[in-house]
Amino acid sequence: MSAQTITTTETTQNAQKPQQYHWRMVWRNIILYIIMHLTGFYGLYLAMFYAQWKTVFYSWFLLVIALQGVTAGSHRLWAHKAYKARLPLRMLLCIFQTLSLQNHIYDWATYHRVHHKFVDTNADPHNSRRGFFFSHMGWLFIEPHKDVEDKYKSIDFSDLHADSVVMIQKKYYHTFFAPVIGFYLPAAIPWYFWGENFWTAFFVATMLRYCACTNITFLVNSWAHIYGSRPYDKNIYPTESATIAVLTGGEGWHNYHHTFPWDYKTGEFGKYRSNLTTGFLDFMAAIGWAYDLKTVSEEMIMKRVLRTGDGTRKFDKIDKILNVDDDHHHEDMLWGWGDSDMAKEEMNYVKIHNRKED
């Protein structure tokens, strides 16, 4: 074999090798998260020993509504279209979501749709197969995998572009929403109204809240993709975790959620003690601010459990379920209501509560 032949063969083999993924660090995010955690822990120290009880309670309240901004707002409403909201509710959720300081709604919702559509692949921004830390927050410390950006372009975001609340927040997020609503006002209110030291208020009501809200939310991406049962689809990584459900206000029923992402409850049972967000949305529906709340019929749930579940979910009456096969493949993933790959049969089994005309 000639040297030219060897060179040609080596060139062909190298061309066939998949392009290696190299980390490119995002130092801005790394520095930001170091500062966030250091100041958050300092805020915890102040909350325990120096802050007024009113400041501590107020900070806890801000944490609760910030989580609602994420769960009811950027997640169930804008990412998954699991229900529809009148303008007053969309404005309220926009303010709540800003308090989470998890970037603007548009960024949150668009990348979350990519996460669902391509869950736990290289196209998933926080692919849990790359480890607990990566899926928790490490994904923010490096540039996204090329597949993330490529697949991002295949998802429809036209509904977000048509939402004036989303686009106004996106336009003014870094100049008004984050600095004023997210950072300054939460600290200024305790200082102005009950004489709390401003810096104590800042570290407790702003930085501790920011740190806690971020880590609680991120546990859904990490913990709830690794630990727990898979009663609805054993072929995917997301799991059921009651602990995460309580911490996040209902986002821990993650195997169910990835199986039926358009359900406004993000869980089969929707008990308020482990799904605070469902209670919030039911109240909003009662006063007319939320409508067209989508959920899944019991028959559809049973069929899916028997077909792809891990056997941990039991039913009292399964004899009415007919022609159920055991599939051992990864079901086509959906990002939520409106995904073009959603089967007509699935749409027929969806229940819509509080249906109203736009």
Curated annotation (Swiss-Prot):
Catalytic activity, EC: 1.14.19.6
Transmembrane regions listed in the UniProt entry: 30-50, 55-75, 175-195, 200-220
Binding site for Fe cation 2: H115, H225, H254, H258
Broad class of enzyme this protein falls into: oxidoreductase
Residues given in the record as Fe cation 1 binding sites: H75, H80, H112, H116, H257
Homology family: Belongs to the fatty acid desaturase type 1 family.
Record bears the keyword Ribosomal protein: no
Motif (Histidine box-1): 75-80
Topology with respect to the bilayer: Multi-pass membrane protein
Organism: Tribolium castaneum (Red flour beetle)
Coiled coil (residue ranges): none
Localization per Swiss-Prot or TrEMBL: Membrane
Names of required cofactors: Fe(2+)
UniProt cofactor note: Expected to bind 2 Fe(2+) ions per subunit.
Keyword Metal-binding: yes
Catalytic activity: (9Z)-octadecenoyl-CoA + 2 Fe(II)-[cytochrome b5] + O2 + 2 H(+) = (9Z,12Z)-octadecadienoyl-CoA + 2 Fe(III)-[cytochrome b5] + 2 H2O; (9Z)-hexadecenoyl-CoA + 2 Fe(II)-[cytochrome b5] + O2 + 2 H(+) = (9Z,12Z)-hexadecadienoyl-CoA + 2 Fe(III)-[cytochrome b5] + 2 H2O
Main location: membrane
Sequence motif Histidine box-3, residues: 254-258
Domain-related comment: The histidine box domains may contain the active site and/or be involved in metal ion binding.
GO function terms (MF aspect): acyl-CoA (9+3)-desaturase activity; iron ion binding; stearoyl-CoA 9-desaturase activity
Keywords attached to this entry: Fatty acid biosynthesis, Fatty acid metabolism, Iron, Lipid biosynthesis, Lipid metabolism, Membrane, Metal-binding, Oxidoreductase, Transmembrane, Transmembrane helix
Descriptive protein name: Acyl-CoA Delta-12 desaturase
GO cellular component: endoplasmic reticulum membrane
InterPro entries referenced in this protein's UniProt entry, alphabetically: Acyl-CoA_DS
Lineage top rank: taxon: Eukaryota
Role played: Catalyzes the formation of a Delta12 double bond, acting on monounsaturated fatty acyl substrates like palmitoleoyl-CoA ((9Z)-hexadecenoyl-CoA) and oleoyl-CoA ((9Z)-octadecenoyl-CoA) with higher desaturation activity on (9Z)-octadecenoyl-CoA than (9Z)-hexadecenoyl-CoA. Requires preexisting cis double bond at the Delta9 position of fatty acyls to be able to insert the Delta12 double bond.
GO BP terms: unsaturated fatty acid biosynthetic process
